[in-house]
UniProtKB/Swiss-Prot annotation:
Residues 5-148, 153-294, 300-443 form the Jacalin-type lectin domain. GO terms for molecular function: D-glucose binding; D-mannose binding. This is Mannose/glucose-specific lectin. It holds the Pfam family Jacalin. Residues 1-447 are annotated as: 3 X approximate tandem repeats. Sequence repeats lie at residues 1-149, 150-295, 296-447. Keywords: Lectin, Mannose-binding, Repeat. PubMed:11502201 authors report the absence of the blocked N-terminal residue, together with 3 to 5 amino acids from the N-terminal part of the protein. Mannose/glucose specific lectin. Shows agglutinating activity against rabbit erythrocytes. Homodimer.
Amino acid sequence: SLKGMISVGPWGGSGGNYWSFKANHAITEIVIHVKDNIKSISFKDASGDISGTFGGKDPRENEKGDEKKIKIHWPTEYLKSISGSYGDYNGVLVIRSLSFITNLTTYGPFGSTSGGESFSIPIADSVVVGFHGRAGYYLDALGIFVQPVPHGTISFGPWGGPAGDDAFNFKVGSWIKDIIIYADAAINSIAFKDANGHCYGKFGGQDPNDIGVEKKVEIDGNLEHLKSISGTYGNYKGFEVVTSLSFITNVTKHGPFGIASGTSFSIPIEGSLVTGFHGKSGYYLDSIGIYVKPRDVEGSISIGPWGGSGGDPWSYTANEGINQIIIYAGSNIKSVAFKDTSGLDSATFGGVNPKDTGEKNTVSINWPSEYLTSISGTYGQYKFKDVFTTITSLSFTTNLATYGPFGKASATSFSIPIHNNMVVGFHGRAGDYLDAIGIFVKPDTAV
């Protein structure tokens, strides 16, 4: 499935009823009741969702156990695995003890470790995204749902000119800590250092008569992380090169460095962590792009939205592959709706004006061999009694084809130079019409 979950276990007995819990976000709290065995368990995720309590149905006061709370300091800390033991308690085979293993430490053991069968999971590069098992009076059995730690990265760009003898391309294992820029009227060169002290570059700077002035950006990875870049590219001394650059973190914007001239570029992106750069260089920095990975465990990145500020916000995330898009369009986009391979239909976003509903268009996507990778389109003013800023045209791009444009193109266009990704959802604003639209993407290695 798109979610890429693996089920491990359960361990324990066959009593009680089956249960399962899959977190929408990272698991941040586990509450257990425990004495000589695990009486009950419940979970909370980063969005504040609580799972309900599994077990703990023995009505006797002396069987309630003591409450223990494990807090996981996501996103720096995340749950990787569990271990424990199961054995006889009051004539029932149940979970006797449990430990919770994160990337930083082990919490536990909780309960009685003497006797019974122990279990552990020799697993690496995993994130626990849910639990399953059996429960009734006590916690009879327990297993986990895991995902791989998302190593997958998405490439944006490059932006700039086509020249440059030296291509560069790197990804870091930690975070980008220092950026050293030489710039004057353009970006002469750039170099990077990661948190482990590895250096990348210098890229560019081969004109001995024009090296620029040194500037340095320092990023404290505990509080601040690089999430995007923006800049301009254009003609400098007869070359098409990057003329200015800014580095956008979750805290601030560093820059611009150089002098803005020519064509501007930016990428409205959230939930992202820049893990590397790519591009070309020679005398100057000819072009630059970024590698990003999802900052959160669930692994989707939000891009956009583009369009107007009217209507109400909406969002849709598919359970499986998106295989159908229904667009009502005329001189603008009236509404969109989506369907995925699990048969889940989204709501219709837009289309509230009954006097202006447009023509129906259906895009069918032959998932899994074909999958949605991006969108492009235009937005601008649309008049029906009042004037609205809405999405006026839309195209949908898959790994195989582009469908559209639907609607009628207007002045302001948008597109996303993006690779190695899959669209897993949409968001935006809508009311009488489709006011704005953006996408949620994942690295396609997560398919």
